[in-house]
Amino acid sequence: KTITFPAELKVADKHSTGGVGDKISLMLAPIAASLGLTIPMISGRGLGHTGGTLDKLESIPGFRTQFSIEEFRKLVLEHNCALAGQSKDLVPADQKIYALRDVTATVESPGLITASILSKKIAEGAKHLIIDLKIGSGAFMPDREKAKELAELLISTGERFGLKVKVAFTNMNSPLGLAVGNGLEMIEAIEYLKGNPLKDTKILTSELTAQLLVSTNLAETAEQAIAMIEEAVKNGKALKKLEEIIVAQGGNPKVIDDYGLLSTTKYKLPILSPASGYVSHIDCRAIGYALIHINAGRMKVTDSIDHSTGALLIPKIGDFLEKDEPIGEVHCNDQIKGEEVVKLIQKAYTLSSEPIAEEPIIFDIV
């Protein structure tokens, strides 16, 4: 089954290949919808070291992500946006193929990745798509060559189905933003929409949203699009849109001002820098896996998660750290496991005595 929308609507979406601390959809969807785009976003859950948009949204009390095709379409038409999980009648084969890929060592097959991403987007009725293709220690694409091959396949396959695809190659060598973990990332997204963005998430959210505004002719240039995006945050339209989506999907809108509803844990354990030096490498994958010990993520699809747990992590590649300087904190409900996670996160940072260049957030857009 596929969903169709009236031809005059500018139906667009974004897909990320998955990373650590990647809460971009939570800002992009309300911003884009507040600027006149129609966003029928079908998202996934977290698995392994990567987080999932649905889990982040479900940290909002009452927020529903499962709808019939009819309900989903109605929500999108009424609010310009809905964020939901796959339903049984939409791309039913994808879940079966995914389970097979898992046990046949073909999770990284470019053809199967393309089929999985695009089948959802074609089925949900999108006509314009920006793909955030992550490269680095927290991505499943370790290098640019493999990423390029996948990008070409996504663009050419999309074209055959009337889907205009742009691909951004982005940096996943440092966790994105500050928060990693569901409720904590939701808080960070709300703060962004209140006009308090962090540098890396601002660059990424603005650029990806701008690509959609230009692709749909709502903006003539990326510069004009970015000005529109900044205005939507400044005048509160984007935050209002998020609140509208929360209410429409059964969530408690009080989370916008009461963060305790999103994340309250028994313990907040400090993470101190194990040595002095410049951050030369961050094993983002190891950080993602470490947080599974406190139930911030899951190893199997059936695992349940604790939406309140996670970590706040300050350092990025190139930053200088003093020994014992606070570099973040672990939010957990089990102190012993939390202390284990602190140690694992400390190990994920490699420090060098030589200065390290800051890395770009976006390598290229094709």
Regions found by a protein language model. Give the residues of each.
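Alpha-helix C-terminal capping segments
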Residues: 26-40, 120-125, 160-161, 215
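Well-ordered secondary-structure scaffolds
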Residues: 4, 106-108, 113, 123, ...
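Active-site cofactor/substrate anionic-group-binding motifs, chiefly glycine-
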Residues: 1-43, 47
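Glycine-rich tight-turn/loop motif centered on a GG-T
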Residues: 56-66, 100-107, 140-144
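Phosphate/diphosphate-binding glycine-rich loops and adjacent basic-rich segments that engage nucleotide
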Residues: 77-126
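A glycine-rich helix N-cap at a beta->alpha junction
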Residues: 56-82, 152-158, 162
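Short beta-strand segments
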Residues: 42, 76, 84-86, 117, ...
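Short acidic, glycine/serine/threonine-rich loops at helix termini
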Residues: 25, 43, 50-55, 86-88, ...
